[in-house]
Amino acid sequence: MIGLIGKKIGMTQIFNEVGHLMPVTVIQVEPNTVVALKDKEKFGYSSVVLGLGELKEKHTSKPYAGQFSGDIKPLKLLKEFRDFDKEVAVGDKLGVEAFEKVSYLDITAISKGKGFQGVMKRWGYGGGRASHGSKFHREAGSTGHCTTPGRSFKNTTMPGRMGFDKVTVQNLQIVKIDPELGVIMVRGSVPGKKDATVFLKSAVKRAK
């Protein structure tokens, strides 16, 4: 598996080689720094820790800065990728060219927050009649039972805070890679708002 940290720029559309219009998401990947390497002998598993984004010294605590060795300055974002397929060393820089032999990606990000929402928006309830004397429009209706069990079961769909969850979209096709601009385009949409941090990994359910 190969992974990188990126930033969602936004969506646009391009024509493919057949002439069909295709929606794509543009993701910017600045050079990721290899912060640490973990092996099976010491940690029980093998992984690579990547970092991105400079962090001012006044915003860095000594325990946090202690995990950066050598000439590597403290970085804002850290992400650990297990079973890394590429041979790397601490201090190396990785860009979008790492995905040149990859066709599909799994992308993880924090979805857009919607705030407190009702059952119609959050769970797709149909609601009640809009007219003819109805006094039941957007309510959830009954959520409980009779004397037995005398309560509402857990995980009953109710109003509540919606969105702002960790979401992974699998098997997004890579449409274009531009190493000069540090940009990668994938087919379809990606979770999160503009400028959101996204984690890109080679798809686990496909060979490449």
Curated annotation (Swiss-Prot):
Pfam families: Ribosomal_L3. Residues 144-158 have a biased composition (Polar residues). PROSITE patterns: RIBOSOMAL_L3 (PS00474). GO terms for biological process: translation. Residues 134-159 are annotated as: Disordered. One of its GO terms (molecular function) is rRNA binding. InterPro entries: Ribosomal_uL3, Ribosomal_uL3_bac/org-type, Ribosomal_uL3_CS, Transl_B-barrel_sf. Keywords: Ribonucleoprotein, Ribosomal protein, RNA-binding, rRNA-binding. GO terms for cellular component: cytosolic large ribosomal subunit. SUPFAM superfamilies: Translation proteins. Part of the 50S ribosomal subunit. Forms a cluster with proteins L14 and L19. One of the primary rRNA binding proteins, it binds directly near the 3'-end of the 23S rRNA, where it nucleates assembly of the 50S subunit. Belongs to the universal ribosomal protein uL3 family. This is Large ribosomal subunit protein uL3. The gene is rplC.
